[in-house]
Amino acid sequence: MNLKEHIRVIENFPKEGISFKDVTTILQDGKVLNYTIDKLAENLKDKKIDKIVGPEARGFLFGTPLAYKLGVGFVPVRKKGKLPYETISCKYDLEYGQDELQIHKDSIKKGDKVAIVDDLLATGGTIASVVKLVEELGGEVVNVSFVIELTDLKGKDKLEGYDINSLVQYNI
């Protein structure tokens, strides 16, 4: 299956000059969603993963079914103030300003082998923050997987030294 054929591209969204890659078309088609999760799982089958971690919000959409498929737990990473228990935080830069991500303190145990999953790799700032959170809790990031990678934005540069997979690549 050519997954790229199932990703809707919307030009000039959310603002002029942006070519938005819409993954909701993957989610709407059961066969395409199953294929996507199977391909993500294939990349992890020999990694002995303990947990899947996914950032808000679209990381939840692919991370949770992937965790189910692999028979492991899923850990959400959310924006500040959205998790109910004790958390640790990591700030990261946005185009204009900063944002902050949080993870529950008890969600990753020392030595847990963790795969991080998200829908899209752009500049890498969000995922670099997720990596920091996992490692601060003592987890070992053994893989970082994406459905889509925007190669021209060089997000992999912020993740140097980590095993990275993406199912579809776009040059923007």
From Swiss-Prot:
Segments passing through the bilayer: none
Protein's recorded name: Adenine phosphoribosyltransferase
Localization terms from the record: Cytoplasm
EC number(s) on file: 2.4.2.7
Gene Ontology cellular component terms for the protein in this record: cytoplasm
Function: Catalyzes a salvage reaction resulting in the formation of AMP, that is energically less costly than de novo synthesis.
Record keywords, A-Z: Cytoplasm, Glycosyltransferase, Purine salvage, Transferase
Disulfide pattern: none
SUPFAM superfamilies given in the database record: PRTase-like
Subunit structure: Homodimer.
Protein's organism: Clostridium botulinum (strain Hall / ATCC 3502 / NCTC 13319 / Type A)
Chief location bin: cytoplasm
UniProt family annotation: Belongs to the purine/pyrimidine phosphoribosyltransferase family.
